[in-house]
Regions:
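Class I SAM-dependent methyltransferase Rossmann-like catalytic core
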Residues: 1-32
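A short SAM/SAH-binding and catalytic strip from SAM-dependent methyltransferases
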Residues: 106-128
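A short glycine-rich, Lys/Arg-flanked "PGG" loop and its adjoining helix->strand segment in the class I
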Residues: 123-144
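Conserved SAM-binding strand-loop segment of SAM-dependent methyltransferases
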Residues: 83-94
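A short acidic, Gly/Pro-enriched loop at the edge of an enzyme's catalytic core
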Residues: 95-108
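Conserved SAM-binding motif I beta-strand of class I
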Residues: 59-65
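Conserved SAM-binding loop of SAM-dependent methyltransferases across substrates and taxa
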Residues: 45-58
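Conserved class I S-adenosyl-L-methionine
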Residues: 33-46
Length: 188
């Protein structure tokens, strides 16, 4: 039996190195995002998107492949019922996502596209998707008029950029601009 691919490390908030989660929260403030459903790829130990968006009344589904990040989520929601009601983080490999388990989203973050792909991820034996297939899945799960956001300073942007460029040509999306360090697309 194959084990699930997961990350053996964790990510604390280092805004000077990777400000994407903080900039996302700023973007939602600027866009007045309220009462929306958000999918967030890569929670970090800080859970700043889940916490702030939950407090604003948005619903957040977050995924982490880090045991430590998930354990901190459990501690967080155990101590904060309001956050627990509006923020659901799960531990898993995003490349194994089953679309039948997901609702539709108004906003999707793809800040870590191409960062966690293992050599066996898309193999028939493991059953995972490629980064492009995963991006297509979340595009399908994004409502018309919804947003997909990327982080061009990602450690894997050299690979993700090509995936995004091809995706932009083939999917019903349009680039609407940049916000601080984020690249923003809207689904038509």
């Amino acid at each position: 039996m194959l084990k699930m691919n997961y990350w053996t490390d964790k990510w604390d908030l280092h805004e000077d190195i990777c400000p994407c989660d903080v900039h996302f929260n700023d973007w939602t403030d600027a866009q007045k995002v309220r009462g929306k459903t958000i999918f967030h790829f890569g929670t970090g130990t800080h859970h700043v998107i889940g916490v702030k968006q939950a407090e604003k009344g948005n619903l957040v589904y977050g995924i982490t492949a880090s045991v430590e990040e998930y354990e901190l989520y459990i501690k967080l929601v155990t101590e904060n019922a309001k956050v627990a009601k509006n923020y659901l983080a799960y531990f898993g490999d995003i490349y194994l996502t089953n679309p039948r388990l997901l609702p539709e989203f108004d906003v999707v973050t793809m800040f870590h596209l191409c960062e966690f792909f293992f050599p066996n991820t898309a193999s028939a034996e493991y059953g995972g998707m490629t980064d492009r297939q995963m991006l297509d899945l979340f595009t399908e799960k994004t409502r018309a008029g919804g947003y997909l956001l990327f982080y061009p300073r990602s450690i894997a942007w050299d690979r993700a950029q090509a995936v995004v460029a091809q995706w932009e040509k083939e999917r019903p999306v349009e680039r609407v601009g940049e916000f601080k360090t984020l690249l923003v697309y809207r689904k038509r």
